[in-house]
Every structure is written in C-alpha cells, then in structure tokens.
Amino acid sequence: MANPITLTSLNIADHVKPGIWTKNPDAGVIAKLAPQVQFLAGTTDIYTFTETPKAELVGEGNNKGSSDYTPSTVTAKMLKFHLTYRFSDELKWADEDYRLGVLQNLADNIMVGSSRALDLAGIHGINPATGTVSNLIPDYIMKSRSGVADLDAAAAALQANGYTATGIAFDPVYAGELARTKESATSNVPLFPELGFGFGFDSFRGLRAGASNTISGSEEITRTTGALIPQAIMANWKAFQWGIIRNIPLELIETGDPDGQGDLKRKNQVAIRAEVALAFAIMDKDAFAVVTKTAA
C-alpha cells in the first residue's frame, strides 16, 4: 500500500507561484497591471499625496513660506480567502505520481481562485463565494462609481484628473466586440488589429492590457436591471497596490467537518484546504476610469 499523502511540507508558492498570477488566462488581471508591494498582517494606514507638489520660488534673503498641503490616508486591510476541496479518502492510497498530479492540478486551481479573488474584491468589493458586497472590504474600484461610455471618454477622464494611463483591463466580451470592429461599414480591416480575435493580447494602443471576466464579474454577480456593468478599466495602476501577506500552504484535513458538508470520516473523505492572506489599497479613485454598460 502506498504511504498516506503528506502535505505538511508542501507550499504552493515554492512550486507553482511564479507566473501563474499574471499568465493564467482564467485568472484575474489586476496582478498583471498593478504593482505588488509588501503589506503587513492586520490593518495598515498609508499616507497619500494626490495633489501636484508646487515648489515656492524664494528670493535671496527672503523668508520661506509653508507648503500648505496635508496628506490623506487610505487603509489596507488584510483579507483572508480559502478554497476547500473534498476527495475520496482513497486518494491517500494512490501511487505517488497520481497524488502529485492531483496536487498540481489543485494548486493551479487554487492560484487561479486566489488571483480572481483579488480582482473581485478590488473591483467589486464582493465575496467571490457569494457574489455579494462584503463589509470586510473598506474600499474598491466600483464603490460609488459612475461609468463612462467608451475608451476615449475614459482617457479624457484620466487626463482631466491629471493622470496618465498605464494599462487597461478588459472584460473578454467587450474585448471581442472591439476586436471585431472594422474601420468602416464596407471594410474588413480591423480597427484594432492588436487585439486579434480578442484572445491572449498583452497590449492595446500602446498600453499594457489584459482580459478577464472578473472585470464584469459575470460569473459571480447577479445584477438587477439598470445596474452598471464594468466593460473595461483604464487606469494608472500604480494607484492600486496589493500584496500577499502570507504564502499559500496546502493543509490535509482528515477528521471533522471543515466546510459544513458533513463529517469526513463518516463520508470516507479527506479535505484539502488552501488559504491566502492578502491586502490591497486604492490610493486615489480618480486614477481609474471605468467603461460601463447598463444591465438589461
């Protein structure tokens, strides 16, 4: 008989973390566009300077005036997410190659879920498991947000707010619509050839770009008629800072009821759980312009 599965020394970050946050097409897009920084556990207040600094010209022998500007603060709160999967306890008896294959697939899935969680919390403020806004998330991009009609209007809004765009996050359906847009009604020449068919693109009109349905939240959020649905977010993504506070370990659970689905021993099951603690902070909401449509 094969030895029972042992996960105490396995850490996802040591094996599959590099690249999966930014390259997996099913994952989120914020981690591709926004800088990752270090956050500590708990709640962190960050000083922000959103006004343009204005230096004073001082004549020889003249007194210097005060730079009359008080910084504001934003709060980054640690958020914990978990994924828990159940398997038949026969998994413990499988050969090593099979067990490692299961763990690799599970690790990939967990990292995708964690990446999507960052987007769904940071853009919509929702608990990904329920699709509803969570009071654990103090601020998010769509909070009290009005949208703009198209990308030109998004660029104009950023410019009016004194920001330069660094990237665009697309909903895949909207990206596909743009990819199929032609130069004219009688032309077959794509207006945006860099989008190809709307899959796997990394840039758009000179800006870094990515696509995920986390932008609209179409898989998680049920919207009422008239609600705003994000189609694209053009932003100076330096204003969205995020970080992983704790690596993502796998835990094998063989007893108890870890997810409310019944006793593991009674059901001849084991559970594998991964948790991630992360934080993010939005430095200035004016650094984001959101193209939206209205739910029918």
What feature does the model see in each segment?
Residues A55, K80, L120, H124, ...:
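Cell-envelope/extracellular anchoring and linker segments
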Residues R86-T164, V290-A296:
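Alpha-helical scaffold segments that mediate packing/assembly in large oligomeric complexes
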Residues M1-G28, Q36, L252, P258-A296:
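Protruding loop/beta-arch "assembly-hinge" segments enriched in small, turn-prone residues
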